[in-house]
Amino acid sequence: MIAMPVRMQQGSEGDGGGPSRGTSVITRTKPKTKKPSLYRVLLLNDDYTPMEFVIHILERFFQKNREEATVIMLHVHNHGVGECGVFTYEVAETKVTQVMDFARQHQHPLQCVMEKK
């Protein structure tokens, strides 16, 4: 909240148009905006999806370069799950849907999920 003192002009207020000697305070309130919740998009390991396909997914849908995609893919392979990125709800939901649809089109059982950070 911001408070600013304001001097009143002569004849603008008072008793019948005479000079006013008071001051008024005008307050402006800024609405508090809440940052949107963030969601992690995760790939889950399976025994059937080729590693090269996972790298392609990371490059295509998450704009990872070859090196970053390979590191994430190996993490998924070795640990069972890996983070592709952190996004707002709508973006994360869209990415999960895109990955799942693309994997199904290519007949791979790859799973992609999102969880609140």
Swiss-Prot record:
Q: Which SUPFAM superfamilies match?
A: ClpS-like (SSF54736)
In this chain, the stretch annotated as Disordered covers 1-33
Q: Gene3D superfamilies annotated for this entry?
A: 3.30.1390.10
Name its GO BP terms in alphabetical order: protein catabolic process; proteolysis
Q: What role is this protein assigned?
A: Involved in the modulation of the specificity of the ClpAP-mediated ATP-dependent protein degradation.
InterPro entries per the record? ClpS, ClpS_core, Ribosomal_bL12_C/ClpS-like
Protein name listed in UniProt: ATP-dependent Clp protease adapter protein ClpS 1
| Name of the coding gene | clpS1
Q: Which PANTHER family match?
A: ATP-DEPENDENT CLP PROTEASE ADAPTER PROTEIN CLPS, ATP-DEPENDENT CLP PROTEASE ADAPTER PROTEIN CLPS1, CHLOROPLASTIC
Q: What is the organism field in this record?
A: Rhizobium meliloti (strain 1021) (Ensifer meliloti)
Q: Which family does it belong to?
A: Belongs to the ClpS family.
| Subunit-level organization | Binds to the N-terminal domain of the chaperone ClpA.
Residue ranges annotated as coiled coil are none
